[in-house]
Curated annotation (Swiss-Prot):
Biological role: This protein is one of the early assembly proteins of the 50S ribosomal subunit, although it is not seen to bind rRNA by itself. It is important during the early stages of 50S assembly.
Gene (UniProt): rplM
Native source organism of the sequence: Prochlorococcus marinus (strain MIT 9515)
Molecular-function GO term, any one: structural constituent of ribosome
Subunit structure: Part of the 50S ribosomal subunit.
Protein name as catalogued: Large ribosomal subunit protein uL13
Amino acid sequence: MNKTITPSIETIERNWFLVDAKDKTLGRLATEIASVLRGKNKPTFTPHLDTGDFVIVVNAEKVEVTGKKTSQKLYRRHSGRPGGMKVEKFESLQERIPERIIEQAVKGMLPHNSLGRQQFKKLKVYKGSEHPHAAQNPVSLNS
């Protein structure tokens, strides 16, 4: 009888992938990234282990959304204080902090537990085309 082998933390190989967000649709891009962060593209995928890879996203300010979402999509955050709810539209958040748009989209597609938080730490998002991870030799992710 065959036994399923659970990979140990030492045997998990982590690769670095580079994604250019220029002219990509936000949701389609986020699903690709979340899949790689979880490790679902690997034959050693295990749901309860962090088997995923690192993902570097560049040109975050050039990501696109379809329809009227640029003027209608709202991003909410709360300071934790009474009356501390802040609401911001997609276009103003894209001018101010474009990294947060991709981060929130991907974070919502990861597990909502400690494993998801651990996988989310492997996502690196940058506003422009420059990133400080050249030493890791990232491979372009075909998406």
